């Protein structure tokens, strides 16, 4: 199931750097993290859903690239984000 409009707006409001910010790395990573966690729950109960597994791996790769970009641009923002999202880095 895709992320609902209300949930996405909630995540954007929490991680946006300013009003109307939807494209900053923090927002993109936060939305991807929610989607990744949701897909992990789905895969736990549907182990043979290979299409979803592939989509999950693509999202993980996209998040990894964004995290690398943010780490290179601003280490402090990177550390704050991974602490607030609970990522293991």
From Swiss-Prot:
Pfam families xref list: Ribosomal_S15
GO BP terms: translation
CDD domains noted in UniProt: Ribosomal_S15p_S13e
A GO MF label: structural constituent of ribosome
InterPro entries assigned to the protein according to its UniProt record, in alphabetical order: Ribosomal_uS15, Ribosomal_uS15_bac-type, uS15_NS1_RNA-bd_sf
Gene3D superfamilies: 6.10.250.3130, S15/NS1, RNA-binding
Entries under SMART domains matching the protein: Ribosomal_S15
Keywords assigned by UniProt, alphabetized: Ribonucleoprotein, Ribosomal protein, RNA-binding, rRNA-binding
GO cellular component, one term: cytosolic small ribosomal subunit
Family label: Belongs to the universal ribosomal protein uS15 family.
Biological role stated in the UniProt entry: One of the primary rRNA binding proteins, it binds directly to 16S rRNA where it helps nucleate assembly of the platform of the 30S subunit by binding and bridging several RNA helices of the 16S rRNA.
UniProt subunit comment: Part of the 30S ribosomal subunit. Forms a bridge to the 50S subunit in the 70S ribosome, contacting the 23S rRNA.
NCBIfam families per UniProt: S15_bact
Protein name listed in UniProt: Small ribosomal subunit protein uS15
Protein's organism: Lactococcus lactis subsp. cremoris (strain MG1363)
């Amino acid at each position: 199931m895709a992320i609902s409009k209300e949930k996405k707006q909630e995540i954007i409001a929490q991680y946006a750097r300013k009003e109307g910010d939807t494209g900053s790395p923090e927002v993109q990573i936060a939305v991807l993290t929610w989607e990744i966690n949701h897909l992990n729950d789905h895969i736990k109960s549907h182990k043979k859903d290979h299409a979803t597994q592939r989509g999950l791996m693509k999202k993980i790769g996209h998040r990894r690239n964004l995290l690398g970009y943010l780490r290179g641009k601003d280490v402090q923002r990177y550390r704050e984000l991974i602490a607030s999202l609970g990522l293991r880095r």
